[in-house]
Amino acid sequence: IHEAGGLVSVGVDVLSLGVIKPPGNYDVDFVIGEGQLLGNVPAAGGPLLGILASKYNRKWIQAIPGRLVGATNEMNSNSPGYCITLQTREQHIRREKATSNICTNESITAVNAAIYMAALGKRGFVELSQGLADRGHYLAGRLGEIDGVSAPLYQPFFSDFVVDFGNITHDVLEKECIERGFVPGIKFSDEGCKRLIAVSDLHSKEDLDNFVNVVKEVLQ
């Protein structure tokens, strides 16, 4: 793509970055992601925390929406300090031409994410990522052992994966599983009964095993 004069952007699951190489290691130009899962609650679609990063390119940075906070050192103590940078992009200078007008201000989600990551620390973040990967692959393996079920359909994967539940319909699978206390993921395709399954750090091994037993019962 670069040889043809194009730019490369990649979307990432930020929680996977504790166990896989970060995008900066494979020469992409832009990285996008969703930070809602960094200490924020699943609030039925909002407020959310968008993540956007680029290589250092002054032209690109000037065009990025939102306010930019830069890291520097305090003048007297030389301690780390942070301030809004490139302020010529801002509303109080450029008014209606400001690029920070493009996005909404949902700073509380960014504060939550900062607190969450600070509380985890580097080691905690790696352990969280590894735990999610382990749960996802364990559940995919258990579901794949059920007759008529194919899991995972696509590899490699981190913690979310697609399952083909066979001849059952989406409506019947949802109804029967929900009645038993489980949501069987979300519809992935109208072809067959393919659904996207996700795990989280709140799911214990017992939870995953119980879900497998429910699926077995429903598919009998």
Describe each model-derived feature in a short phrase.
Residues 1-81, 148, 163, 167, ...:
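Conserved PLP-enzyme active-site core in the AAT-like
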Residues 38-147, 151-154:
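Active-site C-terminal subdomain of aminotransferase-like
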Residues 123-210:
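Conserved C-terminal alpha-helix-loop-beta "cap" of PLP-dependent enzymes
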Residues 214-218:
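C-terminal alpha-helix
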